[in-house]
Amino acid sequence: MARSADIDINAGARLDRLPTCGFHWRILALIGAGMFLDAFDIYLAGGVLGAVLKDGWSTLELNAAFVSATFVGMTIGAWLSGILGDRFGRRFSYQMNLAIFGLASIAAAFAPNMMVLIVLRFIIGIGLGAEIVVGYATLTEFVPAASRGRWIGLLAVITNFSLFASSMVGLWVIPTLGWRYMFGLVGILAMVVWILRKSMPESPRWLAANGRADEAEDILSAIEAEAARKGPLSAVVASVPAQESAGSVWRLFQPPYLARTLLGSLLHIVVGFSLYGFIGWLPSFMVKGGHSVVSSLGYTSVMALGGPVGSLIGLVLADRLGRRLSIVGSSIAAAVLGLAYPHMADGIALAAVGFLLVTAIYVMLATGFAMHVPELFPTRYRLR
Protein backbone atom coordinates (compact mmCIF):
# COMPACT_ATOMS: atom_id res chain seq x y z
CA MET A 1 0.00 0.00 0.00
CA ALA A 2 1.32 3.47 -0.91
CA ARG A 3 2.17 5.71 1.96
CA SER A 4 0.34 9.03 2.05
CA ALA A 5 1.54 11.07 5.00
CA ASP A 6 4.69 12.26 6.70
CA ILE A 7 3.65 10.50 9.91
CA ASP A 8 4.16 7.13 8.16
CA ILE A 9 7.77 7.73 7.11
CA ASN A 10 8.84 10.40 9.64
CA ALA A 11 10.89 12.25 7.01
CA GLY A 12 11.97 15.14 9.23
CA ALA A 13 13.02 13.00 12.19
CA ARG A 14 14.91 10.56 9.98
CA LEU A 15 16.88 13.35 8.33
CA ASP A 16 17.55 15.07 11.65
CA ARG A 17 19.13 11.97 13.24
CA LEU A 18 21.70 11.44 10.47
CA PRO A 19 25.42 12.03 11.01
CA THR A 20 27.29 14.19 8.54
CA CYS A 21 28.13 12.15 5.44
CA GLY A 22 29.12 12.56 1.82
CA PHE A 23 25.51 13.19 0.82
CA HIS A 24 25.34 16.37 2.88
CA TRP A 25 28.58 17.68 1.38
CA ARG A 26 27.35 16.96 -2.17
CA ILE A 27 24.11 18.80 -1.49
CA LEU A 28 26.08 21.74 -0.07
CA ALA A 29 28.37 21.76 -3.12
CA LEU A 30 25.51 21.68 -5.64
CA ILE A 31 23.44 24.32 -3.89
CA GLY A 32 26.53 26.38 -3.06
CA ALA A 33 27.72 26.41 -6.68
CA GLY A 34 24.41 27.84 -7.86
CA MET A 35 24.23 30.33 -4.99
CA PHE A 36 27.83 31.45 -5.63
CA LEU A 37 27.10 32.15 -9.29
CA ASP A 38 23.81 33.83 -8.38
CA ALA A 39 25.58 36.25 -6.06
CA PHE A 40 28.47 36.64 -8.54
CA ASP A 41 25.93 37.72 -11.17
CA ILE A 42 24.40 40.22 -8.76
CA TYR A 43 27.73 41.72 -7.71
CA LEU A 44 29.25 41.97 -11.18
CA ALA A 45 26.80 44.81 -11.77
CA GLY A 46 28.94 47.31 -9.85
CA GLY A 47 32.02 46.87 -12.04
CA VAL A 48 30.00 46.61 -15.24
CA LEU A 49 28.05 49.80 -14.52
CA GLY A 50 31.25 51.68 -13.74
CA ALA A 51 32.76 50.53 -17.05
CA VAL A 52 29.77 51.36 -19.26
CA LEU A 53 29.48 54.75 -17.56
CA LYS A 54 33.15 55.51 -18.17
CA ASP A 55 32.88 54.44 -21.82
CA GLY A 56 29.88 56.68 -22.43
CA TRP A 57 27.75 53.61 -23.23
CA SER A 58 25.42 54.50 -20.37
CA THR A 59 24.41 57.33 -18.05
CA LEU A 60 23.68 57.50 -14.33
CA GLU A 61 19.98 57.49 -15.18
CA LEU A 62 20.30 54.35 -17.29
CA ASN A 63 22.47 52.76 -14.62
CA ALA A 64 19.69 53.48 -12.13
CA ALA A 65 17.21 51.79 -14.47
CA PHE A 66 19.57 48.78 -14.71
CA VAL A 67 19.72 48.46 -10.91
CA SER A 68 15.96 48.93 -10.59
CA ALA A 69 15.27 46.32 -13.27
CA THR A 70 17.51 43.88 -11.40
CA PHE A 71 15.61 44.20 -8.15
CA VAL A 72 12.15 44.30 -9.68
CA GLY A 73 13.07 41.05 -11.40
CA MET A 74 14.49 39.61 -8.18
CA THR A 75 11.29 40.49 -6.31
CA ILE A 76 9.14 38.76 -8.93
CA GLY A 77 11.50 35.78 -9.02
CA ALA A 78 11.49 35.37 -5.25
CA TRP A 79 7.69 35.45 -5.22
CA LEU A 80 7.30 33.01 -8.11
CA SER A 81 9.90 30.61 -6.74
CA GLY A 82 7.89 30.24 -3.55
CA ILE A 83 4.69 29.43 -5.40
CA LEU A 84 6.34 27.10 -7.91
CA GLY A 85 8.56 25.49 -5.28
CA ASP A 86 5.55 24.65 -3.13
CA ARG A 87 3.48 23.49 -6.10
CA PHE A 88 5.99 21.57 -8.22
CA GLY A 89 8.85 20.92 -5.82
CA ARG A 90 12.17 22.39 -4.80
CA ARG A 91 14.03 20.60 -7.60
CA PHE A 92 11.85 22.09 -10.33
CA SER A 93 12.22 25.57 -8.88
CA TYR A 94 16.00 25.62 -8.45
CA GLN A 95 16.64 24.16 -11.91
CA MET A 96 14.29 26.63 -13.56
CA ASN A 97 15.77 29.72 -11.92
CA LEU A 98 19.35 28.63 -12.70
CA ALA A 99 18.45 28.19 -16.37
CA ILE A 100 16.77 31.61 -16.47
CA PHE A 101 19.67 33.65 -15.14
CA GLY A 102 22.27 31.51 -16.93
CA LEU A 103 20.77 31.82 -20.41
CA ALA A 104 19.82 35.48 -19.94
CA SER A 105 23.37 36.28 -18.77
CA ILE A 106 24.80 34.73 -21.93
CA ALA A 107 22.37 36.83 -23.97
CA ALA A 108 23.41 39.96 -22.03
CA ALA A 109 26.98 39.50 -23.25
CA PHE A 110 25.70 40.30 -26.75
CA ALA A 111 23.41 43.23 -25.86
CA PRO A 112 23.60 45.88 -28.66
CA ASN A 113 22.71 48.80 -26.40
CA MET A 114 21.94 49.74 -22.81
CA MET A 115 18.17 49.47 -23.17
CA VAL A 116 18.41 45.86 -24.32
CA LEU A 117 20.84 45.16 -21.47
CA ILE A 118 18.33 46.59 -18.98
CA VAL A 119 15.55 44.34 -20.32
CA LEU A 120 17.83 41.30 -20.14
CA ARG A 121 18.89 42.30 -16.63
CA PHE A 122 15.24 42.23 -15.58
CA ILE A 123 14.98 38.64 -16.86
CA ILE A 124 18.26 37.77 -15.14
CA GLY A 125 16.85 39.26 -11.93
CA ILE A 126 13.90 36.86 -12.00
CA GLY A 127 16.30 33.92 -11.86
CA LEU A 128 18.58 35.58 -9.32
CA GLY A 129 15.79 36.31 -6.84
CA ALA A 130 14.44 32.80 -7.11
CA GLU A 131 17.83 31.15 -6.51
CA ILE A 132 18.38 33.02 -3.24
CA VAL A 133 15.06 31.89 -1.80
CA VAL A 134 15.24 28.28 -2.97
CA GLY A 135 18.91 27.74 -2.11
CA TYR A 136 18.81 28.49 1.61
CA ALA A 137 15.39 26.89 2.08
CA THR A 138 16.34 23.67 0.27
CA LEU A 139 19.53 23.16 2.27
CA THR A 140 17.51 23.76 5.45
CA GLU A 141 15.27 20.82 4.52
CA PHE A 142 18.15 18.39 3.89
CA VAL A 143 20.49 18.93 6.84
CA PRO A 144 19.94 17.85 10.49
CA ALA A 145 18.32 20.46 12.74
CA ALA A 146 21.06 20.18 15.38
CA SER A 147 23.77 21.31 12.94
CA ARG A 148 21.62 23.41 10.62
CA GLY A 149 23.14 26.71 11.70
CA ARG A 150 26.62 25.54 10.74
CA TRP A 151 25.48 24.19 7.38
CA ILE A 152 23.60 27.37 6.50
CA GLY A 153 26.59 29.38 7.71
CA LEU A 154 28.88 27.42 5.37
CA LEU A 155 26.49 28.08 2.50
CA ALA A 156 26.53 31.78 3.37
CA VAL A 157 30.35 31.79 3.33
CA ILE A 158 30.40 30.12 -0.10
CA THR A 159 27.74 32.46 -1.46
CA ASN A 160 29.21 35.64 -0.06
CA PHE A 161 32.76 34.86 -1.16
CA SER A 162 31.40 35.74 -4.59
CA LEU A 163 31.52 39.44 -3.69
CA PHE A 164 35.30 39.30 -3.41
CA ALA A 165 35.58 36.88 -6.35
CA SER A 166 33.51 39.06 -8.68
CA SER A 167 35.53 42.12 -7.68
CA MET A 168 38.85 40.38 -8.35
CA VAL A 169 37.70 38.81 -11.63
CA GLY A 170 36.26 42.15 -12.71
CA LEU A 171 39.50 43.90 -11.81
CA TRP A 172 41.26 41.82 -14.47
CA VAL A 173 38.51 41.00 -16.99
CA ILE A 174 36.80 44.38 -17.42
CA PRO A 175 39.91 46.50 -18.22
CA THR A 176 41.50 43.81 -20.45
CA LEU A 177 38.66 41.91 -22.13
CA GLY A 178 35.62 44.11 -21.53
CA TRP A 179 32.49 43.95 -19.41
CA ARG A 180 30.65 41.59 -21.78
CA TYR A 181 32.92 38.74 -20.75
CA MET A 182 31.66 39.02 -17.18
CA PHE A 183 28.13 38.12 -18.29
CA GLY A 184 29.38 35.40 -20.64
CA LEU A 185 31.52 33.79 -17.95
CA VAL A 186 28.80 33.56 -15.30
CA GLY A 187 26.21 32.42 -17.85
CA ILE A 188 28.31 29.52 -19.12
CA LEU A 189 29.24 28.41 -15.60
CA ALA A 190 25.57 28.57 -14.56
CA MET A 191 24.65 26.14 -17.33
CA VAL A 192 27.44 23.78 -16.24
CA VAL A 193 26.01 23.79 -12.71
CA TRP A 194 22.51 23.28 -14.14
CA ILE A 195 23.72 20.03 -15.73
CA LEU A 196 25.43 18.89 -12.52
CA ARG A 197 22.32 19.67 -10.46
CA LYS A 198 20.22 17.23 -12.47
CA SER A 199 21.54 14.54 -10.12
CA MET A 200 20.24 16.37 -7.04
CA PRO A 201 17.20 14.70 -5.40
CA GLU A 202 13.93 16.30 -4.42
CA SER A 203 13.46 17.30 -0.78
CA PRO A 204 12.01 14.29 1.12
CA ARG A 205 10.29 16.71 3.51
CA TRP A 206 8.47 18.34 0.60
CA LEU A 207 7.57 15.00 -0.97
CA ALA A 208 6.17 13.68 2.31
CA ALA A 209 4.25 16.89 2.99
CA ASN A 210 2.66 16.62 -0.47
CA GLY A 211 1.46 13.02 -0.25
CA ARG A 212 4.33 11.51 -2.27
CA ALA A 213 5.59 9.32 0.54
CA ASP A 214 6.83 6.47 -1.66
CA GLU A 215 9.22 8.80 -3.49
CA ALA A 216 10.30 10.32 -0.19
CA GLU A 217 10.94 6.83 1.21
CA ASP A 218 13.17 5.91 -1.73
CA ILE A 219 15.31 9.02 -1.28
CA LEU A 220 15.44 8.67 2.51
CA SER A 221 16.49 5.02 2.26
CA ALA A 222 19.34 5.91 -0.09
CA ILE A 223 20.55 8.72 2.19
CA GLU A 224 20.33 6.48 5.27
CA ALA A 225 22.22 3.69 3.53
CA GLU A 226 25.07 6.07 2.76
CA ALA A 227 25.08 7.54 6.28
CA ALA A 228 25.02 4.04 7.82
CA ARG A 229 28.44 3.30 6.34
CA LYS A 230 29.88 5.47 9.09
CA GLY A 231 28.26 3.38 11.80
CA PRO A 232 24.85 2.44 13.26
CA LEU A 233 22.21 5.16 13.03
CA SER A 234 20.49 6.44 16.15
CA ALA A 235 16.86 5.58 16.74
CA VAL A 236 14.20 7.70 15.06
CA VAL A 237 12.31 9.96 17.44
CA ALA A 238 8.73 9.90 16.23
CA SER A 239 7.23 13.26 15.37
CA VAL A 240 3.67 14.11 14.48
CA PRO A 241 3.47 16.63 11.65
CA ALA A 242 1.00 19.45 11.64
CA GLN A 243 -2.09 18.59 9.65
CA GLU A 244 -2.55 22.08 8.23
CA SER A 245 -2.24 22.22 4.45
CA ALA A 246 -0.22 24.88 2.68
CA GLY A 247 -3.27 26.90 1.74
CA SER A 248 -3.12 30.49 0.55
CA VAL A 249 -0.15 32.81 0.83
CA TRP A 250 -2.41 35.05 2.94
CA ARG A 251 -2.03 32.50 5.73
CA LEU A 252 1.38 34.11 6.32
CA PHE A 253 -0.39 37.30 7.37
CA GLN A 254 -2.43 35.58 10.08
CA PRO A 255 -1.40 34.30 13.52
CA PRO A 256 0.88 32.61 14.34
CA TYR A 257 2.85 33.53 11.20
CA LEU A 258 2.13 37.27 10.99
CA ALA A 259 4.90 38.33 13.38
CA ARG A 260 7.38 36.00 11.68
CA THR A 261 6.44 37.34 8.25
CA LEU A 262 6.91 40.94 9.38
CA LEU A 263 10.27 40.13 10.98
CA GLY A 264 11.47 38.22 7.92
CA SER A 265 10.35 41.02 5.59
CA LEU A 266 12.10 43.65 7.71
CA LEU A 267 15.35 41.65 7.68
CA HIS A 268 15.17 41.24 3.91
CA ILE A 269 14.54 44.96 3.35
CA VAL A 270 17.35 46.09 5.66
CA VAL A 271 19.88 43.61 4.26
CA GLY A 272 18.87 44.25 0.65
CA PHE A 273 19.00 48.02 0.97
CA SER A 274 22.31 47.96 2.85
CA LEU A 275 24.01 45.39 0.69
CA TYR A 276 22.89 45.97 -2.87
CA GLY A 277 22.32 49.70 -2.56
CA PHE A 278 25.81 50.32 -1.19
CA ILE A 279 27.90 47.79 -3.11
CA GLY A 280 26.03 47.98 -6.41
CA TRP A 281 26.44 51.74 -6.75
CA LEU A 282 29.92 52.15 -5.30
CA PRO A 283 32.02 51.78 -8.51
CA SER A 284 29.70 54.11 -10.45
CA PHE A 285 29.95 56.81 -7.79
CA MET A 286 33.74 56.48 -7.73
CA VAL A 287 33.99 56.74 -11.52
CA LYS A 288 31.69 59.76 -11.49
CA GLY A 289 33.91 61.26 -8.77
CA GLY A 290 36.99 61.08 -10.99
CA HIS A 291 38.46 57.68 -10.17
CA SER A 292 39.52 55.37 -13.00
CA VAL A 293 37.69 52.10 -13.56
CA VAL A 294 40.75 50.19 -12.31
CA SER A 295 41.11 52.21 -9.10
CA SER A 296 37.38 52.06 -8.33
CA LEU A 297 37.42 48.29 -8.81
CA GLY A 298 40.54 48.10 -6.62
CA TYR A 299 38.85 49.92 -3.73
CA THR A 300 35.76 47.76 -4.17
CA SER A 301 37.88 44.59 -4.07
CA VAL A 302 39.37 45.57 -0.70
CA MET A 303 35.93 46.27 0.73
CA ALA A 304 34.63 43.04 -0.81
CA LEU A 305 36.87 41.03 1.50
CA GLY A 306 34.29 41.88 4.15
CA GLY A 307 31.89 39.44 2.43
CA PRO A 308 33.61 36.16 3.31
CA VAL A 309 35.00 37.60 6.57
CA GLY A 310 31.54 38.70 7.72
CA SER A 311 30.02 35.37 6.75
CA LEU A 312 32.65 33.48 8.76
CA ILE A 313 32.07 35.74 11.76
CA GLY A 314 28.33 35.17 11.42
CA LEU A 315 28.89 31.42 11.32
CA VAL A 316 30.76 31.56 14.64
CA LEU A 317 28.51 34.10 16.36
CA ALA A 318 25.27 32.35 15.44
CA ASP A 319 26.17 29.28 17.49
CA ARG A 320 27.87 31.12 20.35
CA LEU A 321 25.64 34.16 20.82
CA GLY A 322 22.50 33.01 19.05
CA ARG A 323 20.78 34.35 15.93
CA ARG A 324 18.94 37.27 17.53
CA LEU A 325 21.85 38.81 19.42
CA SER A 326 24.09 38.44 16.36
CA ILE A 327 21.51 40.18 14.17
CA VAL A 328 21.04 43.07 16.60
CA GLY A 329 24.78 43.57 17.15
CA SER A 330 25.66 43.52 13.45
CA SER A 331 22.78 45.88 12.63
CA ILE A 332 24.02 48.45 15.14
CA ALA A 333 27.59 48.14 13.84
CA ALA A 334 26.42 48.57 10.23
CA ALA A 335 24.39 51.66 11.15
CA VAL A 336 27.34 53.33 12.92
CA LEU A 337 29.81 52.51 10.14
CA GLY A 338 27.31 53.59 7.49
CA LEU A 339 27.07 57.02 9.12
CA ALA A 340 30.86 57.31 9.31
CA TYR A 341 31.64 56.14 5.77
CA PRO A 342 30.65 59.31 3.81
CA HIS A 343 33.00 61.38 5.99
CA MET A 344 36.14 59.43 5.04
CA ALA A 345 38.46 61.73 3.09
CA ASP A 346 41.40 59.61 1.88
CA GLY A 347 41.47 56.31 0.03
CA ILE A 348 42.91 54.21 2.85
CA ALA A 349 40.26 55.33 5.32
CA LEU A 350 37.58 54.86 2.66
CA ALA A 351 38.68 51.28 2.03
CA ALA A 352 39.15 50.45 5.73
CA VAL A 353 35.77 51.73 6.90
CA GLY A 354 34.15 50.28 3.80
CA PHE A 355 35.64 46.87 4.63
CA LEU A 356 34.27 47.03 8.18
CA LEU A 357 30.88 48.17 6.91
CA VAL A 358 30.65 45.31 4.40
CA THR A 359 31.75 42.88 7.13
CA ALA A 360 28.95 44.04 9.45
CA ILE A 361 26.39 43.83 6.64
CA TYR A 362 27.43 40.27 5.87
CA VAL A 363 27.25 39.19 9.50
CA MET A 364 23.67 40.48 9.38
CA LEU A 365 23.08 38.67 6.09
CA ALA A 366 24.50 35.34 7.27
CA THR A 367 22.72 35.26 10.63
CA GLY A 368 19.45 36.91 9.64
CA PHE A 369 18.71 36.28 5.98
CA ALA A 370 20.41 32.89 5.62
CA MET A 371 19.95 31.24 9.03
CA HIS A 372 17.13 32.84 10.99
CA VAL A 373 14.42 33.52 8.40
CA PRO A 374 14.21 29.97 6.89
CA GLU A 375 13.86 28.54 10.40
CA LEU A 376 10.86 30.77 11.18
CA PHE A 377 8.50 28.80 8.93
CA PRO A 378 7.53 25.13 8.51
CA THR A 379 8.12 23.24 5.24
CA ARG A 380 4.70 24.10 3.79
CA TYR A 381 5.41 27.85 3.97
CA ARG A 382 9.21 28.02 3.81
CA LEU A 383 9.49 29.15 0.17
CA ARG A 384 6.54 31.55 0.34
Task: Give a label for each model feature.
Residues 1-384:
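Transmembrane-helix signature of 12-pass secondary carriers
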